[in-house]
Amino acid sequence: MDFLELARKRYSVRAYKPQAVEDQKLAQVLEAVRLAPTAANNQPIRFVVIHTAGREQELRRIYDRDWFVSAPIVICGCGVLAEAYVGKGGRNTAEVDVTIATDHLILAATSLGLGTCWIGAFDPQAAREVLGLPQGVEPMIFTTLGYPADTPEPKERKALEDIVRYETW
């Protein structure tokens, strides 16, 4: 499938089959993370893979949704702030780097028939505690990973001319 077809196929999956994700497919989506670009190639990204079976109650502390804990795998994208490039104005790029790597993961998963869902509204303190994150490692994004048990609804997107400007605003 070409890239635009892949981008159109991706959707936020909120129901998962109990079927396990094969190790080979998990390795492929994690390789996509590894290959993602980062500012100045500093690679301040770390990903924690969590198999949810038997951990549902503690994972609910992070994000209390049935569909979150019903996915066979949940992945947390973390940034190591001290390793990230700091640009002009003091902007630390760790969150941007983690976001790019997570998008690589999500698109790779989609290409393999797996479903995902971005989760940004999680409890960061609970994530630090449940995942045992060391000082200086910040949880930035979660995604579920598994085989979809739902069907995508039509996506509403703004028209291109509403989001793109040429040369100046």
Where does each model-flagged region fall?
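C-terminal helix-cap and adjacent tail motif
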Residues: F3-V13, K17-A20, K25, I141-W169
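Active-site helix/loop module of the DD-peptidase/beta-lactamase fold
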Residues: I119-G136
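A glycine-rich helix N-cap at a beta->alpha junction
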Residues: W67-A71, I75, G132-P154
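Acidic, metal-associated active-site segment
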Residues: T102-T110
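Glycine/small-residue-rich phosphate/adenosyl-binding loop
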Residues: K25-E31, L35-A101
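Structured binding elements
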Residues: G113
